[in-house]
């Protein structure tokens, strides 16, 4: 359940940001936009409903991607440790494309470190 390009543009407009960025900037922009669009603060009720819908959809898509990345990391780590599990090259290409480029720094560094180990082993 990912955002379409139209929904992405609409969310950017409602948030008032040029780019959504990572989860932290998305949340900050969302909270700021809630103050603008909330009906109790003089905002439009329909705009607020749409903002909530698009924000939740973006969060679900982001968490699904994060779950997929961790799944691939775990499978890759098992294959790295056992050295007896062969995974096709397409798996690794897909995995590399899914690696997050932004987000909270806690998981980002560990993902990058493990991914680089897995990719080095697969190249050899």
UniProtKB/Swiss-Prot annotation:
Its main location: host cell. Residues 10-96 form the J domain. SUPFAM superfamilies: Chaperone J-domain. InterPro entries: DnaJ_domain, J_dom_sf. GO terms for cellular component: host cell cytoplasm; host cell nucleus. Gene3D superfamilies: DnaJ domain. SMART domains: DnaJ (SM00271). Keywords: Activator, Early protein, Host cytoplasm, Host nucleus, Host-virus interaction, Oncogene, Phosphoprotein, Transcription, Transcription regulation. It is found in: Host cytoplasm; Host nucleus. Signal peptide: none annotated. The common region of ST and LT proteins comprises the J domain. This domain is essential for multiple viral activities, including virion assembly, viral DNA replication, transformation and transcriptional activation. This domain is also required for cyclin A-transactivating activity of ST. Promotes efficient viral genome replication by accelerating both G1 and S phase progression of the cell cycle. This is Small t antigen.
